[in-house]
Amino acid sequence: MTRPIRPGAARLAAFCALVVTTVGCATGGPGPATPPEHPLNHRIWDARSGQFVSQEQFLDAAAGADHVLLGEVHVNPYHHAAQESVLAALVARGRRPAVVFEMMERDQQPGIDALRAARRPTADELAEATGFSDSGWDWPLYRPLVALALEHELPILAGNAPIDETRALVKDGVDSIEPERWRTLGLDRPLAPAAQVALVDIMVQSHCGHAPGDYAERLVEAQRLRDATMAEVMLGAAPAPTVLITGSGHARRDFGVPLYLEEWAPDARLLTLRLVEVDPGAIDPADYRDTIVGLPRPFDYLWFTPALERPDPCE
């Protein structure tokens, strides 16, 4: 389902039409749970100024950043369409970012590089070579992004920590990770107490309240390992700018990937975006800020989209 590559302005217009009319059939999945007439849908909120901005204003800001983090709800096709439009617009503005994917693990990078050195692969060929297409991620949602990066010969970087590494960390704790690597990633230094409490709560909720003993703490350590690894990969792309395709939790400034980017590259210009599913009962952007008391603002921008209806995994 690779879509043709179009210039940034045309792609933005096509995106606006697409998200209003066809997203339900684009994936074969459920349609939007919130109607397209929600007053926030497809609007962008600058959380720094407290003002709505146009897509062009947002894209101009993104083009001026060294690292752009696009935080998604993984299963929402509106979010992937928005990410694609942002990447296309950056290319149209003369930027050539490395595209870093949370969905690919760092030990897959040699396979990506070898395949691209041998020929110009299709997105499906790259997915097959890396195992992306049968990894549990919804490959059709990510195919257009990978195809766009390949079409423009942008670097494609596997950003995440290897699954064997994170599984061992959750099972056996930090002793499973080589001490020097743990220190190099800055993981020997604790999070701010408010961030630690928030992350533990997120992990407990994500496991439907079942996280006995120190299990939630080990899940937090695995989350931090993923965040630090993605930051390391992004900085390793220098001098190229980067775009990170990731879940919104990893894109947070208060405890996600930006925390490590700012520590290791304090002069780098970051832009963090949360793609937000609207709530029918919340029409004020302030209702979506998700700020934790005592911690930095989590996102620079909020881009509102319809929500998708899906079953509660805890029921």
Regions found by a protein language model. Name each.
Residues 26-65:
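N- or domain-start disorder-to-order transition segments that initiate the globular core
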Residues 22-24:
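C-terminal motif of bacterial Sec signal peptides marking the signal peptidase cleavage site
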Residues 31, 229-235, 250-315:
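C-terminal regions of proteins
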Residues 73-76, 104-108, 162-166, 248-252, ...:
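Solvent-exposed loop/turn segments at secondary-structure junctions
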Residues 74-100, 106-118:
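Membrane-embedded segments
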Residues 50-51, 55-92:
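Zymogen propeptides
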Residues 2-14:
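Bacterial N-terminal signal peptides that target proteins for export
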Residues 110-237:
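A substrate-binding/cap region within the structured catalytic cores of diverse enzymes
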